[in-house]
C-alpha cells in the first residue's frame, strides 16, 4: 500500500540516535549518480513470526537493495539498515542480497555491499543460518565473474565477517568493527590491549584493503575505485 511504501522509505532514512552516521538510503544516494538508483524488493519483510517477531516492524527486512550508476556504469548495491533490528541477517534479508548477485552476474556488473550488521538474527535460528550459507554460495559462484566490493561502515559481526573477506576488495571506515568473535573472546585480551575488531588491526592482518577516515571518504574512494573497473 501507499502507507507501507511511505513507512519503508522513511524507516530506511533513519539514523542511529546520537551517531553521526548516514542512513542505509543516504549511503546509497551518496554512492551512485544522482537519481539513478532503482530499488528492488522494497516491500519484502521478515517471514518469521517466532519469538514475538510478528510484533516487530522490519521494513525491507533490514536491507535496501537495487541497482544504479556510478559515472554511468551499472552497479548492484545492498545497504544494510542498522536502524532495523540492527541490520541483522534473516531469511528474507539474505534472499534479497542473493537476488542482487543473480542480477549482477546476469548483467556482468559489480556488486557493492554497504555493511552495517549486528550479525545473525537469532529469532530466525536455522533460517538465518541458511541465509549466511546462501550468501557465501553466491559469492563463491560470482568469484572471477564479477567484481565484489564490501564496505564496512559500522559493525560487521559474526558470519558476515566471512562475507567481507570473500569479496575481492574490502573498504573499512576507521571507526568500524569487523569480527567473527568479540576481541574479549580471546583469553586474557581486552580491546584496550588489542582491538582485533578495529580497522588498524584488520588492515595489518590484510583482511581489509582500504581504511578510510570517515563515511564520506569511504564512499568517494569506492566511486573512484569503480571508475578503474573494465
Spans of features found by a protein language model:
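Terminal-region recognition feature
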Residues: 2-149, 155, 160-162, 166-178, ...
